[in-house]
Amino acid sequence: MINKAVEQIDDLLEPQDWSFPVPIVYGPGRLSEISTHCLGMGIQNPLIVTDKGSAHLPFIKQLQDFLSLANIPSALFGEVSPNPLEKDILAGREKFHNGKHDAVIAIGGGSAMDGGKSICLTANNNYSIWDFEFEQPVPIIHQDQPFPTLVTIPTTAGTGAETESTAMVTDVNKGMKFCVWHPDLK
């Protein structure tokens, strides 16, 4: 009976490709494929976004090394708070612009996912992060201001934030977390 359970667990770890509605590449060791995926999506200079707790962990260096080996320059923004704040998003947006990045790779847990998605929401337009608040009318994104390409790499088992266009951001003035989103962010 134990052997059967082990076999079932092993089956879950087999490499798989899904679409939910975004493509999902799943399985141990798949980080090594990041350059191939970036090149396939036309990504030339991504901003890597993660939380403060993950910024110095080995998988960040591995990601940077895989990109570098494929001659894909990147920069790291590792300043996302455990519950992302507007100031984190503004600082990430500034780093995105200053580095002339064309994509965001969000890697880490839910906060990194939320930070990366929020930076994408505001990167190429003049909207505030609060203009994307879930209860508000959806902002119009013009063709000349598309969202940057977003790649999400979850390192924790959690809410599935990597599959959604929503993010949670904390408004310190109101002492509340708000859901921000746009249906075109994928």
Residue ranges and their predicted role:
Residues V25-Y26, F77-V80, I153, V180:
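Hydrophobic residues at beta-strand termini and immediately following loops
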